[in-house]
Design a protein with these regions (language model features):
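Non-catalytic alpha-helical scaffolds and adjoining flexible linkers that form interface surfaces
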Residues: 3-36, 41-270
Length: 270
């Protein structure tokens, strides 16, 4: 089979019914005995679906390019109800992830987040695509479980920010004053932190250590690829607390329950 370059694919997209995009495979569904539907997140159009014809046949021209968690440059043919994938050139198959079950599960979690939250995100599609790509790459290249977990936590925070569900970590949601005390509380329902004084009335039960708050602020504020002192000093226990807190927040504010959450919770508890 010819190995087409991304540039070649773009040059061949000459008709109005054809288009080219870069996309990451998130889910697949059986369509019939030979074909599959691939759900992808694309740089230009957000969530898209495409039919991979003949993908189940041994000599399929698309082959492993349609595996989950693979980034491709694609040429697609627009259809009335479903587009068809004509050509694909792999940009990154995140090979190191496929060799490690923990990395597979963490990558599956972030891809499921995009599936659950990505509907209607076309205006921010390039930003979300780049964030997803960086995160999958960071998970693949991580050498310690802690580093892979930090990548997931950064993704949770930054995707929530893009989608308009940002966690409030600086000021009390009740009195709107900056929380400077070491003692504070966290409310998933309200969307962030509550100061000690206000909580005497509210009665939020979940205490948040100020170091957890500081860690989350750093993960949200710094560039994705920047390794801060917080990254270096964090341990798996800190990551476990932060992951669970953010996952509960996501479930509360989006009404979307992640199917992979339980597996990840078991993974970080090991």
């Amino acid at each position: 089979m010819k190995n087409y370059s991304a540039g070649y694919i773009r040059e061949q997209s000459l008709t109005m019914n054809n288009y080219v995009t870069e996309a990451i495979n998130l889910k697949s569904y059986n369509l019939n005995d030979a074909d599959k539907i691939i759900l992808m997140y694309s740089k230009e159009n957000g969530l898209i679906k495409g039919v991979a014809k003949g993908i189940k046949k041994p000599k399929s021209k698309l082959g492993a390019r349609m595996d989950l968690l693979v980034a491709n440059t694609l040429q697609l043919l627009k259809g009335r109800s479903m587009d068809t994938i004509l050509q694909a050139q792999t940009v990154n198959n995140f090979r190191k992830t496929k060799e490690d079950i923990d990395k597979i599960m963490l990558s599956s979690y972030v891809s499921e987040l995009v599936v659950n939250l990505g509907e209607g995100s076309e205006a921010a599609s390039e930003e979300i695509y780049e964030l997803l790509y960086k995160d999958l790459n960071r998970i693949a290249d991580s050498t310690e479980k802690k580093d892979a977990l930090i990548a997931v936590i950064k993704f949770q925070l930054k995707l929530l920010l893009i989608m308009g569900f940002c966690v409030e970590l600086d000021t009390c949601l009740c009195c709107r004053e900056r929380v400077l005390d070491e003692e504070m509380f966290f409310s998933s329902q309200m969307g962030g932190i509550i100061c000690k004084e206000c909580n005497e009335t509210l009665g939020v039960k979940l205490k948040m250590h100020h170091k957890i708050r500081d860690f989350l602020q750093a993960m949200l504020q710094f560039d994705f690829n920047y390794e801060s002192d917080y990254d270096k000093k964090a341990n798996e226990k800190v990551c476990q607390v932060c992951f669970n807190l953010l996952d509960e927040y996501i479930k509360t504010h989006t009404n979307k329950k992640q199917k992979t959450t339980k597996v990840i919770q078991e993974l970080v508890a090991l």
